Amino acid sequence: SGVALYYLLTLVGYYILALPPAFRVCRIMPAPPMTQRSLTPRLMGRWFAIGIALMWIGSLVGTALNDLVYRIAGLQPVDMVTETFDMLPLSVVLLGACILGPVCEELLFRGLLAGRLARYGQKPAALVSALLFGLYHANVSQFFYAFALGLLLAYAYFYTGSLKAPILLHMLFNFYGSAVVLLLPESGILPVLYLASWPVLTVAGVILLVRGRKRQVWAHGPCEPSIQTIFCNIGMTAAIVVCFVETALLFL
């Protein structure tokens, strides 16, 4: 369909055409070395539960604020993400949202952005990359959970020292949040179990996050963190402005 073609062309424009120049520019700023740690099934399960909790809570906040902004603007609230995926074939959702998107976004936001900013410390790098990851989605309803997931994915990247962890997690999050509902029948026990899994995983994720907050490992970088250095430059300013403009256009 036309919507599917537009979606795929947008992905090609955002990822395939944008990544090579980004890699070329970032070569002048090598990423500092990171400690390598094993990615175990237990660790993946823990991060998955925490991620689902962040997605659900962030989605509730984002959807409420999105509806409020639409009503203030005198418009009928619209969920652009749900409407878009409802119009796409399952094959396009699997290819775009569950494979191509996670790989390219992790290369860009974690591998390039967070990895290079880690010279100012891993925690500031995670915050900045998560902020841009949230803004990049260019809509209010997705910003909060995208920002929260960006923090988790950056932590997984820094903790393991490999992009394999954030890429796999990103694929799982997108598959569970976007594709599973398209695979389920419209009636029966499976949709009920799927819906029930969200609050159950959210409770488990919050417990794991609270219990593990003091065991978090963030390395310091060789350079002092500087808001002026990170944000007060043409590239960062342009990226933030473009994201805000894209978001604002939804309400016109």
Which residue ranges define each predicted feature?
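Alpha-helical transmembrane segments in multi-pass membrane proteins
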Residues: 1-26, 192-200
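Alpha-helical membrane-inserting segments
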Residues: 17-25, 54-69, 156-160, 176, ...
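Membrane-water interface of transmembrane alpha-helices
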Residues: 16-30, 64-68, 202-218
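Juxtamembrane/transmembrane-helix boundary motifs at the membrane-water interface
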Residues: 1-9, 71, 180-189
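Transmembrane helix-loop-helix hairpins at the membrane interface
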Residues: 91-251
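Cytoplasmic juxtamembrane interface segments
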Residues: 22-43, 129-132, 180
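Juxtamembrane helix-loop-helix connectors linking adjacent transmembrane helices
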Residues: 2-3, 31-107, 114-118, 250-252
